[in-house]
Structures are given as structure tokens and as C-alpha cells.
């Protein structure tokens, strides 16, 4: 049976992962990357036709209609123009991954910092 992971398991992947030991959060490079990421998310949310065209460029075996359905199902509901993550979805995902790995879970808001 073929299945898409997003049909069964939701992990918010919006954002940028930074190890503050190597790249301080307030560094100009990290801040520039955050701004670029937010611009990209805003474009995906505000210009769905552009996003669908881009997705189609690397999922080139899919028809335009299939790519549009993909966007509507896996992109539009989860990628917001402001880059914020739904912490309820994130909590469920973090707990599920921790359970699968047999490790203690951590607070989702510790992973998905909204202060940047």
C-alpha cells in the first residue's frame, strides 16, 4: 500500500533550525535567513498559482490538477503567511516522535520559537 506521510503524521516544518552555540539567534545572518523564510512563506500563502507552478517544476510527473490538489492538501493548510506554527499540531507531532523513539517529549514551544 502506498501512502503519503502527511496523510497519517503531521509535523510542522515551517521555519529554520538554528543551534545557538554555533549561530547566535540575534546574528545578522540568522535574522536575514528568518526574513527570507518569512518572505517565501508569504509568497506561498498569498500567491498559490506561483507556489503551484514551482511545486510542479520538481514534481514534474504530476499533472497541474494533481499538483494543485497536493498544494491544497499539504501546503495551504499548514504554511501560513506569517510563518507561525499551530502549536497543537506541533505538540502532537513532538509527542508522537518522542514515543516512537522511546525518549521523553519536550514542549513544542521550546522547539518552535515564535519570538523571531
Residue ranges and their predicted role:
Residues 1, 104-105:
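Short secondary-structure junctions
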Residues 5-6, 20, 85-88:
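Short, structured secondary-structure boundary patches
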Residues 1-11:
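Short beta-strand->loop
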Residues 18, 81, 87, 113-114:
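Generic structural "secondary-structure junction" signal
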Amino acid at each position: 500500500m502506498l501512502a503519503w506521510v502527511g496523510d497519517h503524521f503531521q509535523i510542522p516544518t515551517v521555519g529554520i533550525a538554528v543551534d545557538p552555540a554555533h549561530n547566535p539567534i540575534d546574528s545578522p545572518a540568522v535574522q536575514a535567513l528568518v526574513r527570507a523564510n518569512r518572505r517565501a512563506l508569504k509568497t506561498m500563502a498569498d500567491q498559490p498559482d506561483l507556489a503551484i507552478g514551482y511545486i510542479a517544476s520538481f514534481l514534474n510527473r504530476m499533472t497541474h490538477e494533481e499538483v494543485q490538489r497536493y498544494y491544497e492538501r499539504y501546503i495551504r493548510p499548514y504554511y501560513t503567511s506569517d510563518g507561525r506554527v499551530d502549536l497543537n499540531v506541533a505538540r502532537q507531532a513532538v509527542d508522537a516522535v518522542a514515543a516512537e523513539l522511546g525518549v521523553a517529549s519536550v514542549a513544542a514551544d521550546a522547539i518552535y520559537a515564535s519570538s523571531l
